[in-house]
Amino acid sequence: MLTLNVIKAIILGIVEGFTEWLPISSTGHLVLVGSVLKMGESKAFMDMFNYVIQFGAILAVVVLYFHKLNPFSPQKNQLEQKQTWTLWFKVILAVIPSVIIGFPLNDWMDEHLMQNWVVASMLILYGILFIVIENRNKQRTPKFADLNTLPWLTAFWIGCFQALSIIPGTSRSGATILGAILIGTSRFVGAEFSFFMAIPTMIGVSILKIGKFFYQGNTFTGDQSIILLVGMVVSFIISIISIKFLMGYIKKNDFKVFGWYRIILGVLVLGAMFL
């Protein structure tokens, strides 16, 4: 049983690592894949598992962008250190809407909207939005092509888009990148800022889920600890690959391919539900 669950944890870790950073909804994919790959664990554990393996994905961002995010780096001059601190304060500002809106509604969303039809609907809706906005921006020059020039108010509005991602199937990265592009950032700046916003957001949600798990009187078994560790390690490795792929891809391409993917997957899910 443990061996089979480890294999399933590896698969879910791969799904998390790829889909967390691509704008296609990691939670949506985990819900869909998890409905097929049943581990035989309690619902409380699986709800917590789907969020806790995000620690691996978060670590990937920290590792890849450590120099850029480290204000204490001796390789940075005084101006660069100041810019790094400013970036962090903008990230904190951007996270506030999710704290105010997302955290209080998180449990309600999990209970009422963590369903395949909701995931499918959001996949389709945001897929259409990606295609429409990319077509609209085809001949436009981004107003903000450098992360250091991103205005404070723009950072806050991007954070408001992140708050929308509490609906399963939306995609945290998808909502923030879409919002950033809509406001006027380049794809590259929108993606990077989305990654950095993920650090406090995902750590906060994961801690919340772990706290809820233990508050309800649950404990980890030895096997469950192994499953969690495997999921996090795999998520970390795949996230490294996923982030590098995305940042290389958007240097020459737009997000429409992800929009079409979302629409096709959403239609397939809805079709499967009604067959």
Swiss-Prot record:
Pfam families: BacA. The chain crosses the membrane at residues 4-24, 44-64, 85-105, 113-133, 149-169, 188-208, 226-246, 255-275. Keywords: Antibiotic resistance, Cell membrane, Cell shape, Cell wall biogenesis/degradation, Hydrolase, Membrane, Peptidoglycan synthesis, Transmembrane, Transmembrane helix. It is found in: Cell membrane. Its EC number is 3.6.1.27. It is a multi-pass membrane protein. PANTHER family: UNDECAPRENYL-DIPHOSPHATASE. Belongs to the UppP family. Bacitracin is thought to be involved in the inhibition of peptidoglycan synthesis by sequestering undecaprenyl diphosphate, thereby reducing the pool of lipid carrier available. NCBIfam families: PRK00281.1-2 (NF001389), PRK00281.1-4 (NF001390), PRK00281.1-5 (NF001391), undec_PP_bacA (TIGR00753). This is Undecaprenyl-diphosphatase.
